[in-house]
Amino acid sequence: MAIKKYNPTTNGRRNMTTNDFAEITTDRPEKSLLAPLKKKAGRNNQGKITVRHQGGGHKRQYRIIDFKRNKDGIPGRVATIEYDPNRSANIALINYVDGEKRYILAPKNLEVGMEVMSGPEADIKIGNALPLMNIPVGTVVHNIELKPGRGGQLVRSAGTSAQVLGKEGKYVLVRLTSGEVRLVLATCRATVGQVGNESHELIKIGKAGRSRWLGKRPTVRGSVMNPVDHPHGGGEGRAPIGRKSPMSPWGKPTLGFKTRKKNKASDKFIVRRRKK
């Protein structure tokens, strides 16, 4: 999908870019696959802010996505490629021959009219989902399961992909987008291909108001807060941090400090750590 640039008719448009949405084939989603989505504004069930910088934004409806890809042996045809406001990737509506309709993540180069299939016997074609044990070494995949039957959890963002590196017993070696090499159960499923809409990362928001349309509230620097609000706060004028390293609002070291738990159970599945 190409990036659309604008003439600098206003300061907000000067550096603004958008998708040209050339791949999108319809603006009317499938009603049977929509669900209501209530805004949380970053609050938990007590009304306390647990995620900062969230709130407002345009009203959305949730699109029910088939991450499990468990409709084995039944071919389906791509009916539409659609925009999804809840994720960076586009989605594809699949019409199966038994009459059922499902949304899947739209891989790169998937087009209307193409056929997709799930199951161990599926061909190695873009959009097909099958167990990792049946996918040849070197194949690019996405939407990878961590537990069989739970549904894809890894590599779902726009433009991302992973690669099958090898097979070791009941596990398969997979290199993720971050560079991390990880062992995944061979019975877990993945979808062949790279996630589409790879130009998403090149979009420039351009103005503050557009961030608000997306439900993103302003991020205030800690150095301009009071000491009660942030470890960087206080002082006369533009005071330095006054600490060994930058801190999070909760007093933890940040900017390079590793936050992963030391003895996490899944450490034994990580063959090589991700790149910085």
From Swiss-Prot:
Claim: Nucleotide-binding is one of the keywords in the record: no
Annotated InterPro entries: NA-bd_OB-fold, Rib_uL2_dom2, Ribosomal_uL2, Ribosomal_uL2_bac/org-type, Ribosomal_uL2_C, Ribosomal_uL2_CS, Ribosomal_uL2_dom3, Ribosomal_uL2_RNA-bd_dom
GO biological process: cytoplasmic translation
One of the record's GO cellular component terms: large ribosomal subunit
MF term (GO), any: structural constituent of ribosome
PROSITE patterns per UniProt: RIBOSOMAL_L2 (PS00467)
Ranges in a coiled coil: none
Record-linked Pfam families: Ribosomal_L2, Ribosomal_L2_C
Disordered: annotated span: 219-276
Keyword set, alphabetical order: Ribonucleoprotein, Ribosomal protein, RNA-binding, rRNA-binding
SUPFAM superfamilies, sorted: Nucleic acid-binding proteins (SSF50249), Translation proteins SH3-like domain (SSF50104)
Subunit structure: Part of the 50S ribosomal subunit. Forms a bridge to the 30S subunit in the 70S ribosome.
Similarity comment text for this entry: Belongs to the universal ribosomal protein uL2 family.
Free-text function comment from the UniProt entry: One of the primary rRNA binding proteins. Required for association of the 30S and 50S subunits to form the 70S ribosome, for tRNA binding and peptide bond formation. It has been suggested to have peptidyltransferase activity; this is somewhat controversial. Makes several contacts with the 16S rRNA in the 70S ribosome.
Protein name from the UniProt record: Large ribosomal subunit protein uL2
Gene giving rise to this polypeptide: rplB
